[in-house]
C-alpha cells in the first residue's frame, strides 16, 4: 500500500480527478454544509448582538455559498480518493486472481427457504 495517497505535494485535486463525474448539487452532504453556513451566519449575528434572523441577510447568503462551495470540493476530493483506492484494489485483484476465486452462482430457489402460507 502507498503511505501517501496524493504523490503530488500541495495538490488538493490532481488533474486526474477531472475525469470523474461531478457531485450532484442535491447531495445531502452539500445541503447539510449549506445549512451549517446559514447557522454560522445566525450565530455570528447572535454573538454581535444583532437581530438574529433579519440582520445581514447578504452575510448569511455569503456563508451559505462559501460553505456549499467548500463542501462541493471536499466531496469531489472524497470521490477522487475513493476512485484511486478502487483502482488500486481492482488492479491488485487482476494481478492476483488466485486469491479471489470465482464463487459458484446460486439461484434464488437455492438461497430462500420454501414458502408455506399460514391458513
Curated annotation (Swiss-Prot):
Membrane topology: Single-pass membrane protein
TM helices/strands, residue ranges: 56-75
Keyword S-adenosyl-L-methionine: no
Pfam families attached to this UniProt entry: NDUF_C2
InterPro entries referenced in this protein's UniProt entry, alphabetically: NDUC2
Keyword tags: Electron transport, Membrane, Mitochondrion, Mitochondrion inner membrane, Respiratory chain, Transmembrane, Transmembrane helix, Transport
Family in the record: Belongs to the complex I NDUFC2 subunit family.
Function: Accessory subunit of the mitochondrial membrane respiratory chain NADH dehydrogenase (Complex I), that is believed not to be involved in catalysis but required for the complex assembly. Complex I functions in the transfer of electrons from NADH to the respiratory chain. The immediate electron acceptor for the enzyme is believed to be ubiquinone.
Subunit structure: Complex I is composed of 45 different subunits. Interacts with TMEM242.
Protein name: NADH dehydrogenase [ubiquinone] 1 subunit C2
Amino acid at each position: 500500500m502507498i503511505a501517501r495517497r496524493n504523490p503530488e505535494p500541495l495538490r488538493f485535486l490532481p488533474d486526474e480527478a477531472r475525469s470523474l463525474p461531478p457531485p450532484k448539487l442535491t447531495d445531502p452532504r452539500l445541503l447539510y454544509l449549506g445549512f451549517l453556513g446559514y447557522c454560522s451566519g445566525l450565530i455570528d449575528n447572535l454573538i454581535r448582538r444583532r437581530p438574529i434572523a433579519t440582520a445581514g441577510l447578504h452575510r448569511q447568503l455569503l456563508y451559505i455559498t462559501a460553505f456549499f462551495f467548500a463542501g462541493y470540493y471536499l466531496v469531489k476530493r472524497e470521490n477522487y480518493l475513493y476512485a484511486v483506492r478502487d483502482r488500486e484494489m481492482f488492479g491488485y485483484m487482476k494481478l492476483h486472481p488466485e486469491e479471489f476465486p470465482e464463487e459458484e452462482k446460486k439461484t434464488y430457489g437455492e438461497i430462500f427457504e420454501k414458502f408455506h402460507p399460514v391458513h
